[in-house]
Amino acid sequence: MHIRSFFLLAAIVAALTVPAALAAPGGPVASASGGIHWTIPLPNAFGVEVVNQPLAFNARKYADGSVSGRFEYHQIVEGTSFDFNVDVTCMNVYDGNRAKIGGVVKSSSDPTIAPGTFAWFQVFDNGEAQQATPDQSSLVGFGDEAANEAFCNSPNLPRFGPWDVQGNVQVQP
């Protein structure tokens, strides 16, 4: 009797596991990752020197349109540091080397940027050869979900920048 129960349980587990495995998205069809920082000296469009703003990100897009990933951004404004942790909700690759990534802020140390706010940026992978120009990035923007989705779904170049970054950007179309 115990053997029959075991086989019945095994059959139920198999019946539940196989459809779940088939429904899971395959590997990513596009991805972007990197660890970068940049310095934007004066004069610039912002009127303040932007110094060493680190950004680490990993985003993947699957054949069914779903995305996964996260990014962490550290911002220093007039000597005060702020940290943002963001879950990726949108990601698109344009021109083969440019990724637009956006998501919802999960945690923020900036009292003016609450969790639930959206954040986005775009990066340029300019190659790995010694003669390659530096990788580039826009700054991180903040706003609502509609602005985030519009940003990711627009092929437009950044309004400000992009700026050369230190570090490495990898974009896979």
Q: What is each of the regions a protein language model found here?
A:
Residues 1-8:
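Bacterial N-terminal signal peptides that target proteins for export
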Residues 8-19:
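Bacterial N-terminal signal peptides
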Residues 24-31:
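Cleaved targeting-peptide boundary
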Residues 32, 37:
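Extracellular protease catalytic domains of secreted zymogens
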Residues 38, 69, 73, 83, ...:
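Intrinsically disordered, low-complexity, compositionally biased regions/tails
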Residues 40-123:
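Predominantly extracellular/secreted and cell-surface proteins with exposed
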Residues 98-100, 105-173:
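Extracytosolic secretory-pathway proteins
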